[in-house]
Swiss-Prot record:
This is Ketimine reductase mu-crystallin. It is found in: Cytoplasm. It comes from the Eukaryota. GO terms for molecular function: hormone binding; NADP binding; protein homodimerization activity; thiomorpholine-carboxylate dehydrogenase activity; thyroid hormone binding; transcription corepressor activity. Belongs to the ornithine cyclodeaminase/mu-crystallin family. It holds the Pfam family OCD_Mu_crystall. Its EC number is 1.5.1.25, 1.5.1.1. It catalyses: L-pipecolate + NADP(+) = Delta(1)-piperideine-2-carboxylate + NADPH + H(+); L-pipecolate + NAD(+) = Delta(1)-piperideine-2-carboxylate + NADH + H(+); L-proline + NADP(+) = 1-pyrroline-2-carboxylate + NADPH + H(+); L-proline + NAD(+) = 1-pyrroline-2-carboxylate + NADH + H(+). Its main location: cytoplasm. NADPH binds at S90, H91, R118, A143, V145, Q146, N167, R168, T169, N172, T204, M205, V225, S291. It comes from Mus musculus (Mouse). Keywords: Cytoplasm, NAD, NADP, Oxidoreductase. Homodimer. Binds the thyroid hormone triiodothyronine (T3); T3 binding inhibits enzymatic activity. GO terms for cellular component: cytosol; mitochondrion; nucleus.
């Protein structure tokens, strides 16, 4: 008799994925495998996006198979622009995990925790490779879910002497600063927040540039995480063109990233190519990691959650 799939709530996913740092080793391996092409055993098309124009929304479908994990997943994610000030989150996601040997559905799990934690973990990987030596100042632009997940892993993995925060709505920035462990300086402007920062994380809902090259310290590293549509951007032309540009996926960046497409910036390497040693990490230069998020990242996290849940049954 066929077994019914497991349904794992956000709380259950959180229980089995308490620290984003757990994801770093398997994500490094998965990113390297992805960038090896067919030889790496990762089958992952660029996400399919269905506009829901009537309601200012989108549905994204993100399937992947990884031979290394022998795992098959797809994530369904929705994004609705007008929900930033309502009780309904702007982003909602579910991850489906299948038995790759026969196609049976093993589990349906909340994808919001997975998305937040795997995105932050990949940013941490990029930062470990690309940040300048002696990085003391971290700046986070944006105060939403991704700001919290990035702060968590960045304060676990690195030893910054100062953390700065800016958000368009100052009240949310102050709430962030009072909620997290550790001291966070709330800044009144993006320029104030980023001036002299060694590592900058942009996790905003911006559709036009908010971070300008003239404000950025030479040699700084930027993780650009927001602006996941081809007509949206967070970084200006000057910054995109003067920095060495790294991406998670060339194919996806050239289809989905307004920061890349609208600036005409050249992509130097995928993050997986740096991990494998195929391309260098230019820590001495200003670097940008444009993160769009990939299905294989969800796969790694979902497999880890499911294996942990299964072992505890």
């Amino acid at each position: 008799m066929k077994r019914a799939p497991a349904f794992l709530s956000a709380e259950e996913v959180q229980d089995h994925l308490r620290s984003s740092s757990l994801l770093i080793p398997p994500l490094e391996a998965a990113l390297a495998n992805f960038s090896k092409g067919p030889d790496g055993g990762v089958m992952q098309p660029v996400r399919t996006v269905v506009p829901v124009a009537k309601h200012r929304g989108f549905l994204g479908v993100m399937p992947a198979y990884s031979a290394a994990e022998d795992a098959l997943t797809t994530k369904l994610v929705t994004f609705y622009e007008g929900h930033s000030n309502t009780a309904v989150p702007s982003h909602q996601a579910s991850v489906l995990l299948f038995d790759p040997s026969n196609g049976s559905l093993l589990a349906v799990m909340d994808g919001n925790v997975i998305t937040a934690k795997r995105t932050a973990a990949v940013s941490a990987i990029a930062t470990k490779l690309l940040k300048p030596p002696g990085s003391d100042v971290l700046c986070i632009l944006g105060a939403g879910v991704q700001a919290y997940s990035h702060y968590e892993i960045f304060t676990e993995q690195f030893s910054f002497k100062e953390v700065r925060m800016w958000n368009r709505t100052r009240e949310n920035a102050e709430k962030f600063a009072s909620t997290v462990q550790g001291d966070v300086r709330v800044c009144s402007s993006v320029q104030e927040a980023v001036t002299g920062a060694d590592v900058i994380i942009t996790v905003t809902m911006a559709t036009e540039p908010i971070l300008f090259g003239e404000w950025v310290k030479p040699g700084a590293h930027i993780n650009a995480v927001g602006a996941s549509r081809p007509d949206w951007r967070e970084l200006d032309d000057e910054l995109m063109r003067q920095a060495v540009l790294y991406v998670d996926s060339r194919e996806a960046a050239l289809k989905e990233s307004g920061d890349v497409l609208l600036s005409g910036a050249d992509i130097f390497a995928e993050l997986g190519e740096v991990i494998s040693g195929a391309k260098p990490a230019h820590c001495e230069k200003t670097t940008v990691f444009k993160s769009l998020g990939m299905a294989v990242e969800d796969l790694v996290a979902a497999k880890l959650v499911y294996d942990s849940w299964s072992s505890g049954k």
